[in-house]
């Protein structure tokens, strides 16, 4: 833990069940920053300790850091966990609301990258069109990926392509719908493509191609122009799209249940591989705690001072009525194991998914 990153909120001290923590002045703890720096720069990921359990998942690097959300905010806990599981290949479309405020404050971002420069690609459009915006992100990258698949199949059909390259290409195609396996296959495929593209200088070293190499060099070309090399170059130009992406649409209950419901319903109905995560605080948290359709009957909130007269909208049952949407409701504080199970199953499901995460909030005024 970095002493420079303490927010001073005191939540850890107040919640420690055995009273082991105390608040002290920052100056006395600053020497511990050297330990933090060592852990960040020198200690590598322990892949053999990382699995999809509550404990194992926490050995993975979080790609959401120091968001500045309210003390005890549950939304950031959910988002952080999702980035730990899929952050290096993750797309996020974020509805306007609390999660866009702590997720994208002016001039900075709490979303970060790993040592390879990979991390969540985050974007915020509007309140009312977030689902459609996220669906567009999915469709765009999927179209590029389909083109890469077609070019890979053309590459496999070329007789003189190197066996090692063909093997890596076939492995990439075979794992295209498996996020974790495809990530490793992508690394091997990119390495094989880079190793098997002939440069003009390498071509010139072969006597029968020397004249052609000179012509290419005169045109300013750097690589061989045979079909295999041209396809390999085209694929490498878009190598960032090779790995299977994990597309997530984040937003609160005011968005998913009320203002953006039409878009949520439409996108889920398309039967495409997108994941919708609703941070359900059961009120409009970002604007001060007004009642939403996610508020419970009898709940006291702004615009419902005498208690809400109607019951909570069953968004999960509406989604389940389609018959092909993965639906889960989670509460990390009550059952963290089920939370991880739901998130990983939603990502693994080759179709639309909806996760509704109960998110305790300061607007609940529970002390």
Language model features with spans:
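Glycine-rich ThDP/TPP pyrophosphate-binding loop and its adjacent helix/strand module
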Residues: 188, 243-248, 258-273, 279, ...
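Acidic, Ser/Thr-rich peripheral helices and adjacent loops at domain boundaries
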Residues: 35-49, 111-121, 291-313, 367
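Ferredoxin-like iron-sulfur electron-transfer modules
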Residues: 1-8, 26-31, 57-67, 241-245, ...
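N-terminal amphipathic, basic-rich helices that act as targeting or association modules
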Residues: 56, 64-96, 100-106
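Amphipathic alpha-helical binding modules
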Residues: 207-234
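Structured alpha-helical segments in the cores of large, soluble enzyme domains
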Residues: 43-55, 141-145, 179-181, 235-241, ...
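Iron-sulfur cluster-binding cysteine motifs and their immediate structural context
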Residues: 1-7, 11-29, 77, 87, ...
